[in-house]
Amino acid sequence: MPIDPTAPYDDDNIFAKILRGEIPSSKVYEDEWAIAFVDINPQAEIHTLVVPKGRYVSWDDFSAQAPDEEIAGFVRAVGKVARAKGLVEPGYRLLANVGENGGQEVPHLHIHLFGGQKLGR
């Protein structure tokens, strides 16, 4: 299903259900701003999804609507997860897909954190 990054937030998306505890996840981190869990279809040795707790469809929605404190808290959470996974020294990749052309599959902002191996160019 194509994701419209300008559409209203859909509370029935899978990440909203994970945030509400309705669907289990392999959680690796949680704070007041974000939750992080292992991707169920990993594309790298380490593939973690970092999801803000706020109701944001995409990076565009988040960057335009979230308060500065929430943006900072989420960005710091991404960094904390990378450090906890031991990814800083060997290196890692961050990815946020936005909309249909960007390959977004879930209408809730999330960052893919890839690592644990040499990643392609």
Language-model features and meaning:
Residues 1-121:
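HIT superfamily nucleotide-processing domains
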